[in-house]
Swiss-Prot record:
Substrate binds at K45, N69, S70, M71, G72, L73, N128, N194, S195. One of its GO terms (molecular function) is dihydroorotate dehydrogenase (fumarate) activity. This is Putative dihydroorotate dehydrogenase A (fumarate). InterPro entries: Aldolase_TIM (IPR013785), DHO_dehydrogenase (IPR050074), DHOD_1A (IPR033886), Dihydroorotate_DH_1 (IPR024920), Dihydroorotate_DH_1_2 (IPR012135), Dihydroorotate_DH_cat (IPR005720), Dihydroorotate_DH_CS (IPR001295).
Length: 311
């Protein structure tokens, strides 16, 4: 029997597919749609210390090869999502989940994580080091010194399972430098990649989103080769204890298969989920299973990370 089950940091998931933070996860109602779908888990909207309205609309637009967005981290506040997940996990058949958070300052980050650490929540937390769409706030994970300092401070008190969501890296040296930092810490996972920041899409003579004069994060088909490269580069470099979540350009079973082949333990879906809705998890799961049957694979471990190279 072919299985797409997986695990991260000892947490079991019946399916390796889930949403990406930012898509179908703003409200309790949306999270419940993912919970009752074929997805193996959900991750909440990235929660900040206080609720945020985000950037002015229009701030998201589909494009022929994906999407562009400059959402600006709209969310209900991290405490809202903590309450939703704690209530949900009281249910007998609850799945395991991820809570996504970000601080708009180091102080905010520590306040959020210290609250999560002292809470009843025992599950996985995804710390976003990679949002490209908050005006005046750089992507932390591109500053290696700041990243190392922040993680050093966090792991001085945080002992629950924690992973980080990363921006795309494009230089081999940066893969080496980033991995060397991450390997110093007891991270449960890294999530590669967030959208490619500061793309520009034009319709006739006008940009198609309002914030930042049209600049926004690019997702969908555009970013799959970059996402696969990041997944595989970190799979080659990170300690085996640090697992990888692959995100970027997944709209078919073949796309999910390629992420796992590059080393991903779970696969998140963003743009395609936004366009197709939660039923996408059923379709992509069946497509992935069909590929596994055709290739004679029973479990994800049969091919995870086993990308072939040319002689």
């Amino acid at each position: 029997m072919v299985s797409t089950a997986t695990q991260i940091a000892g947490f079991n998931f019946d399916n390796c597919l889930m949403n990406a933070a930012g898509v179908y996860c703003m409200s309790k109602e949306e999270l419940l749609e993912i919970e009752t779908s074929a997805a193996g888990s959900f991750v909440t909207k990235t929660g900040t210390l206080e609720a945020r309205e985000g950037n002015p609309e229009p701030r998201y637009a589909p494009t022929p090869l994906g999407s562009i967005n400059s959402m600006g981290l709209p969310n209900m506040g991290y405490d809202y999502y903590l309450d939703v997940v704690l209530d949900l996990e009281k249910e007998e058949n609850s799945k395991n989940h991820f809570i996504s958070v970000v601080g708009l300052s180091p102080e905010d980050t520590h306040t959020i994580l210290k609250t999560l650490h002292s809470s009843a929540y025992q599950g996985l937390v995804e710390l976003n080091l990679s949002c490209p769409n908050v005006p005046g706030k750089p992507q932390i994970a591109y500053d290696f010194e700041t990243t190392e300092q922040l993680l050093t401070e966090i792991f001085s008190y945080y002992t629950k399972p924690l992973g980080v969501k990363l921006p795309p890296y494009f230089d081999i040296v940066h893969f080496d430098q980033a991995a060397a930092i991450f390997n110093k810490f007891p991270l449960a996972f890294v999530n590669s990649v967030n959208s490619i920041g500061n793309g520009l899409v034009i319709d006739d003579e006008t940009v198609i989103i309002k914030p930042k004069n049209g600049f926004g994060g690019i997702g969908g088909d555009y970013i799959k080769p970059t996402a696969l490269a990041n997944v595989h580069a970190f799979y080659q470099r990170l300690n085996p204890s640090i697992q990888i979540i692959g995100t970027g350009g997944v709209k078919s079973g073949r796309d999910a298969f390629e992420h796992i082949l590059c080393g991903a333990s779970m696969v998140q879906i963003g743009t395609a989920l936004q366009e197709e809705g939660p039923e996408i998890f059923t379709r992509i799961t069946e497509e992935l299973k069909q590929i596994m049957v055709e290739k004679g694979y029973q479990r994800l471990d049969d091919f995870r990370g086993k990308l072939h190279y040319l002689d």
